[in-house]
Regions:
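Composition- and surface-driven signal marking solvent-exposed, interaction-prone regions
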Residues: 18-23, 294-296
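Thiamine diphosphate
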Residues: 22-241
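Active-site or pore-adjacent capping/gating segments
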Residues: 1-20
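Generic alpha-helical structural element
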Residues: 1, 56, 60, 280-283
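Glycine-/acidic-rich phosphate or pyrophosphate-binding loops and their flanking alpha/beta elements
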Residues: 66-74, 215-230, 239-296
Length: 296
């Protein structure tokens, strides 16, 4: 009876916000402050080589280059960050997006793994529990399905089941979306974004151009650091090397690198042709340049 009386008097969860709090903590002001906090200037110079070589002092670049630059910046900012996956070290990944990171930060922070996504995401959880900031890479979105439960059943549920006593923050990079015409049925081209979207507590970011990618990465890393969130950064393979938008050589899909104190607000949108009144198109990833070309 004493136990029953004690249970009866224990405070109850009465609102959906109270139930959701440990599953999806959100501290917008703290996240904004962390996302816009630049790495130490001296450290950045050491990483990039000189003032002239800082990415914000370079010409406009395409998506793959700016993700690479943003990763270098994150590693300069967070000494506890780690990047690992299949062929990400010396080779720089299938699309060379991680090229140079191994040389700059050595094998203790950038290293290859077995060709096993379950192992990659299991390592990420272990490192996160140790206080590190892991950025595991899943080589293709199709490969994520082999290890989906590591995120759905483990990483994203830890805060909820422990009432926020334990956290495993991470930013999982995943290359995906369609990228080869006439090759849509191939295993590498599996485009099941639903596998990410339907995971409770998971934050999914998907850029379409370089500057947005850099600022989005900063915000995702900040959400992981501040609120312990598990984040997925979905990188459109078809746009990695895309420089032009309407015509060959127009360079309209190459963008300047955003200053290190700039970041995207969680849930913020980029609006194109804001004065148009005939039609509204809401899209992401590959759909953005397609929609812009269609509108023209």
């Amino acid at each position: 009876m004493a136990a029953a009386e004690h249970a009866d008097k224990t405070p109850k969860l009465l609102t959906k916000e109270e139930v959701m709090r440990p599953l999806a903590p959100h501290s917008p002001e703290q996240v904004r402050a962390e996302a816009t906090r630049a790495a130490d200037a001296e450290t950045r110079l050491k990483v990039f080589g000189s003032e002239k070589q800082l990415p914000e002092n370079q010409p406009p670049r395409h998506l793959a280059i700016q993700i690479n630059q943003a990763l270098h910046d994150l590693f300069a900012k967070y000494p506890e960050s780690l990047l690992f996956g299949e062929d990400v070290a010396a080779k720089g990944g299938v699309y060379t997006v991680t090229k140079g990171l191994h040389k700059a930060f050595k094998s203790s922070r950038v290293f290859n793994t077995l060709l096993d996504e379950t192992t990659i995401l299991g390592l990420a959880q272990g490192f996160a529990n140790m206080g590190m900031l892991p950025l595991p890479e899943i080589q293709y979105l199709a490969y994520f399905h082999n290890a989906c439960d590591q995120i759905r059943g483990e990483a994203c549920s830890l805060q909820f089941f422990s009432n926020d006593q334990y956290r495993n923050p991470m930013v999982m990079r995943v290359a995906g979306l369609g990228y080869q015409r006439g090759f849509g049925g191939h295993f590498h081209n599996d485009n099941s974004v639903t596998a990410l979207r339907d995971i409770p507590g998971l934050i999914v970011g998907c850029p379409s151009r370089g500057d947005d990618a850099a600022m989005m990465l900063r915000t995702l890393a900040a959400m992981a650091r501040v609120d312990g969130r598990v984040c997925a950064f979905l990188e459109p393979i078809a746009l990695y090397m895309t420089k032009d938008l309407y015509e060959p050589g127009d360079a309209l899909w190459s963008t300047p690198y955003p200053a290190p104190d700039q970041a995207l607000e969680f849930g913020a949108e980029r609006v194109y042709h804001g004065d148009a009144t005939d039609l509204l198109i809401v899209t992401f990833g590959n759909g953005v340049p397609f929609a812009l070309r269609t509108a023209k």
